[in-house]
Amino acid sequence: MNKFATLAVFISVCLAVGSCNYGGQHAGHGYGHHRSISSYGQRGDGSAAAASSAAAAGGNDQRPVEIVAGPRYGGSEQLRPILLDSGYQGGHNEYGRGHGNIGHLVGGGSYGGHIAGGNHGGNYGGHQRGYGRPRWSVQPAGTTLLYPGQNSYRRYASPPEYTKVVLPVRAAPPVAKLYLPENNYGSHGGYHNEGPKY
């Protein structure tokens, strides 16, 4: 345990010194540095294990991770990362001073995607415009089931609507046959008496 703690502290110090040097080299120039991980877990500059062990040991270098769901088959849609830093000094500003610790997972195609992480500084391609920029992105609406059959993710859909059929209204048959008496029923006379005549 002591070896692991010592190694984690050493790696945290190396990362802190490296991030300070990075900020001093690129301050005010408007150039961004982009480190990426391919979908198979190979990091460009070889510090993936260092960052993960420092985060596991509770170091100060905590990087938020954003998951952006992309199209499942085919990656024709270009997805942009969402800025996760708060305030005006961090992230992709046009003055080139701040650097934000951003890690995001961009999905595209059927094999997952890639993770692009760490220290984007300066003018990120010249597309960001300062303080009025939105900190969110608009994703297409739809119901997509991630990893079907492997976990408890649910698909949300609208409740079913049933078609309404208007049935014709017609008179119902009588419930019982009523007895209708003849005209001479209950008269006070003989058998053929037709009643009083005036």
From Swiss-Prot:
Its domain of life?
Eukaryota
Q: What is its main location?
A: secreted
Q: Can you quote a single GO CC term?
A: egg chorion
Q: Which residues form the signal peptide?
A: 1-16
Is Signal one of the keywords?
A: yes
Q: Cross-referenced InterPro entries, in alphabetical order?
A: Chorion_2
Where in or outside the cell? Secreted
Query: Which keywords are on file for this protein?
Result: Secreted, Signal
Any keyword Signal? yes
* One Pfam entry name: Chorion_2
Which GO terms fall under biological process for this protein?
A: chorion-containing eggshell formation
Function according to Swiss-Prot or TrEMBL: Chorion membrane (egg shell) protein; plays a role in protecting the egg from the environment.
Q: State the family named in the UniProt similarity comment for this chain.
A: Belongs to the chorion protein S19 family.
Q: What is the recorded name of this protein?
A: Chorion protein S19
